[in-house]
C-alpha cells in the first residue's frame, strides 16, 4: 500500500496537516500564527522528523507569498499617499537602518571579535526586518491602515530599497573585488533603473486596458490569471534588474492602486498570498539547523541576544528622536527587533563572493531564524507593556488616527451602478455620505468616473470582493442590481457572514420579494408596485379626484396588497397560493361586468370563463 502512495503528495498532505493543527493552537495560546508556522516547519524539516529534506526549494517557492503580500500593500498605497510618506521613508527609514547597521557592526567587531567585513555583513543582514512577519503582525492587530502602521510600513519600504546597495557592497568587500570595473557597476545601475521605469510605464498605460479587455470576456478565471500575471511579471522584471522581487510587486500594486480593478485584483490574489506566506514561514522553520544550534547554542544565544538588544535600542532611539511617543516607540521596537528574510539573500551572496565562510553563513542564518522565532514572544511582552499606558478616551488618541476613524463614518456600500444606483448615490453624496460602489460592467464604471464616485470593478456576488471593498467598515449595503438570482445569492451570503449589517434592495417580482422578506432584509422597494402606485395616484388626481381621497384609495390598495403578501410569506409556494395570489386578481369586486369590444376579445374571455368554471367544479 505504501508503495502506491505518491511521496510528493504525502509531503503536501503532511504540510497542510501540520499547519492546520499547530497554527490554530499557537493562535489560541496568544503566540500568533507566525510562531505556529515556524514551529510546524521546524518539526517536519530535516532537523526533526525529516519529512522535507530540501527546505531551500520550499522557501524559494513560498517567497512568492511575500511578493503577493507586498502587492496587496501597494494596492492600498495611492501615489499621493506614498509621496506624502517620503519623509518617513527616506528620513526615519534611513536613520533607523543607518544607526542599526553601525551599532550592530561595531558590536560584532568589539564584542564578538569578528573582522570588519564579516561584522558588516552580519550586522546589516540583521538590520533588515522580516517584511512578512511585521506585515502579518500588523494585519492581525488591525494596524495596517492606521497612521502607526503606515509609519512602520514606510520603514519596511526603505529596508526593501536598502537591500540593493547592500548586495552591491558585497562585490567591493570580496577578496577579488578589483576584477570588477566601474563600467560593470554603471551597467547594473542602468539595468535596475530601466526595470523600474519600464514597470511604472507598464502600470500607468497598459494595465487598465489589459484588464478592461479581460473583463469584457466575462471569464472569472481570466481575471485571476491576469492578476497573477501582473504580480509575477513585476517581480520577474525587478529580479532581472537586480532588485527585490517584493519591491517589484509593491511598485505594481502602487501603480494599480487608483485603478477601478484594485478590489478585484486584491480578492483574486488574497488566497494565494495567505497560503504561500504560511508556506514561507514553514520553510524558514525547516531551514533551522538544530544540530548547529545544539552544538553552538551558547554562541548563537549570545549573538541573538546581542543583536536583538542592539537593534531594539536603535529602533527605540530613532523613534523618540523623530518625535514618536513612548508607546509607539515600544511597539516599533517589538515589531522590528528581529532579522528578516533579506538576511538570507545577503548572507548567501556574501558566502558566494567569499566575504564570509560557509560556517559563518550557517551560524548567522540560524541566529536570524532564532530571532524570528522569538519575535512573536517579544511582541506579546511589549503589548502588555503598552496596554498599561494605552489611552482610555478618544481625546487621548493620536490625531492622525482620528482621520482613520472619521473615514469610517456614514459609509455605504452600493452593489451595482446602473441608473437606479446612480440616483441613490447622488442622493447620498448631496448629504455628504461616503459611498463605495462595486460593479462588473465596464461602461458603468466609465460613466461613474464623470460623477466622481468611488467605483471599483468586481463581482458583488463574491464575498472576498465585498471584503476587499470594505464591507466590514460599511454602515449599510444597498443592492441596485437587476438580477434577482444574484440579489438572493448576495443577501444569503451577507446574512450569514454579517448578520447585523443592514441591507436595502430593489426587487421586480413578488417571488423574490417573498424570499427576501424571509431572509429579514431590512428594506425592500418593489419597483413595479411602487411605480404602479405612483402612476395610479397621478391618474386619479388627473381625473379630478381630490388628493386626500386619492391618498385614501392608494392606502387601501397598499393594505390589501400587504395582506396578500403576508399570506404568501406565511404559506410558501404551494400550488393553491400560486393559483390564488400569483395570477392577477382584483383586490375588490368590479362594479360592472366585463365587456368585449371585438370578436377576438370575446373568444379569449369565453375560454377564460370556461376554464374557471371547470376549476370550481373540480
From Swiss-Prot:
Residues 409-525 form the RCK N-terminal domain. Its main location: membrane. One of its GO terms (cellular component) is plasma membrane. The chain crosses the membrane at residues 6-26, 32-52, 55-75, 94-114, 118-138, 152-172, 186-206, 227-247, 274-294, 298-318, 336-356, 362-382. It is found in: Cell inner membrane. GO terms for biological process: potassium ion transport; proton transmembrane transport. PROSITE patterns: RCK_N. GO terms for molecular function: antiporter activity; monoatomic cation transmembrane transporter activity. It is a multi-pass membrane protein. Keywords: Antiport, Cell inner membrane, Cell membrane, Ion transport, Membrane, Potassium, Potassium transport, Transmembrane, Transmembrane helix, Transport. Transport system that facilitate potassium-efflux, possibly by potassium-proton antiport. Belongs to the monovalent cation:proton antiporter 2 (CPA2) transporter (TC 2.A.37) family. This is Glutathione-regulated potassium-efflux system protein. The gene is kefBC.
Amino acid at each position: 500500500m505504501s508503495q502506491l502512495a505518491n511521496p510528493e503528495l504525502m509531503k503536501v498532505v503532511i504540510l497542510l496537516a501540520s499547519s492546520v493543527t499547530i497554527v490554530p493552537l499557537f493562535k489560541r495560546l496568544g503566540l500568533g500564527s507566525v510562531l505556529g508556522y515556524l514551529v510546524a516547519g521546524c518539526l517536519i524539516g530535516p532537523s526533526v522528523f525529516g519529512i522535507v529534506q530540501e527546505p531551500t526549494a520550499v522557501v524559494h517557492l513560498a517567497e512568492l507569498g511575500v511578493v503577493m503580500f507586498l502587492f496587496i500593500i501597494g494596492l492600498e498605497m495611492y501615489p499621493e499617499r506614498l509621496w506624502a510618506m517620503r519623509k518617513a521613508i527616506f528620513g526615519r527609514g534611513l536613520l533607523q537602518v543607518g544607526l542599526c547597521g553601525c551599532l550592530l557592526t561595531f558590536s560584532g567587531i568589539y564584542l564578538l571579535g569578528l573582522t570588519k567585513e564579516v561584522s558588516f555583513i552580519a550586522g546589516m543582514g540583521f538590520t533588515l526586518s522580516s517584511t512578512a512577519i511585521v506585515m502579518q503582525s500588523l494585519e492581525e492587530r488591525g494596524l495596517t491602515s492606521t497612521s502607526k502602521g503606515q509609519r512602520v510600513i514606510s520603514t519596511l519600504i526603505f529596508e526593501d530599497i536598502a537591500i540593493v546597495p547592500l548586495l552591491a557592497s558585497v562585490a567591493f568587500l570580496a577578496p577579488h573585488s578589483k576584477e570588477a570595473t566601474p563600467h560593470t557597476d554603471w551597467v547594473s545601475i542602468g539595468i535596475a533603473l530601466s526595470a523600474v521605469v519600464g514597470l511604472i510605464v507598464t502600470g500607468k498605460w497598459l494595465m487598465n486596458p489589459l484588464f478592461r479587455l479581460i473583463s469584457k470576456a466575462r471569464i472569472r478565471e481570466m481575471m485571476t490569471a491576469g492578476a497573477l500575471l501582473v504580480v509575477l511579471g513585476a517581480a520577474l522584471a525587478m529580479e532581472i534588474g537586480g532588485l527585490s522581487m517584493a519591491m517589484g510587486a509593491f511598485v505594481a500594486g502602487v501603480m494599480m492602486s487608483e485603478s477601478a480593478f484594485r478590489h478585484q485584483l486584491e480578492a483574486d490574489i488574497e488566497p494565494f498570498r495567505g497560503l504561500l506566506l504560511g508556506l514561507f514561514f514553514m520553510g524558514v522553520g525547516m531551514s533551522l539547523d538544530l544540530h548547529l544550534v545544539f552544538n553552538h547554542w551558547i554562541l548563537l544565544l549570545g549573538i541573538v541576544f546581542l543583536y536583538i538588544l542592539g537593534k531594539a535600542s536603535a529602533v527605540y532611539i530613532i523613534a523618540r528622536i523623530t518625535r514618536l511617543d513612548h508607546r509607539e516607540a515600544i511597539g516599533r521596537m517589538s515589531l522590528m527587533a528581529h532579522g528578516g528574510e533579506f538576511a538570507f539573500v545577503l548572507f548567501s551572496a556574501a558566502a558566494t563572493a567569499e566575504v564570509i565562510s560557509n560556517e559563518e553563513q550557517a551560524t548567522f542564518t540560524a541566529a536570524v531564524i532564532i530571532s524570528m522565532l522569538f519575535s512573536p514572544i517579544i511582541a506579546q511582552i511589549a503589548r502588555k507593556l503598552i496596554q498599561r499606558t494605552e489611552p482610555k478616551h478618544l481625546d487621548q488618541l493620536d490625531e492622525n488616527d482620528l482621520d482613520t476613524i472619521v473615514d469610517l463614518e456614514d459609509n455605504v456600500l452600493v452593489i451595482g451602478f446602473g441608473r437606479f444606483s446612480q440616483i441613490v448615490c447622488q442622493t447620498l453624496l448631496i448629504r455628504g455620505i461616503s459611498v463605495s460602489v462595486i460593479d462588473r460592467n465596464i461602461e458603468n464604471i466609465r460613466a461613474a468616473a464623470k460623477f466622481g464616485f468611488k467605483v471599483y470593478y468586481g463581482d458583488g456576488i463574491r464575498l472576498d470582493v465585498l471584503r476587499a471593498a470594505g464591507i466590514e467598515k460599511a454602515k449599510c449595503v444597498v443592492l441596485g442590481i437587476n438580477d434577482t438570482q444574484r440579489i438572493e445569492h448576495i443577501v444569503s451570503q451577507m446574512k450569514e457572514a454579517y448578520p447585523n449589517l443592514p441591507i436595502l434592495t430593489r426587487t421586480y417580482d413578488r417571488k423574490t420579494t417573498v424570499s427576501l422578506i424571509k431572509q429579514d432584509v431590512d428594506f425592500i422597494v418593489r419597483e413595479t408596485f411602487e411605480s404602479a402606485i405612483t402612476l395610479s395616484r397621478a391618474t386619479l388626481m388627473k381625473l379630478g379626484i381630490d388628493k386626500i381621497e386619492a391618498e385614501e384609495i392608494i392606502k387601501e390598495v397598499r393594505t390589501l396588497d400587504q395582506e396578500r403578501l403576508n399570506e404568501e410569506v406565511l404559506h410558501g409556494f404551494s400550488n393553491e397560493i400560486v393559483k390564488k395570489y400569483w395570477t392577477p386578481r382584483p383586490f375588490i369586486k368590479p362594479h360592472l361586468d366585463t365587456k368585449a369590444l371585438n370578436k377576438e376579445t370575446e373568444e379569449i374571455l369565453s375560454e377564460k370563463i370556461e376554464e374557471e368554471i371547470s376549476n370550481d367544479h373540480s
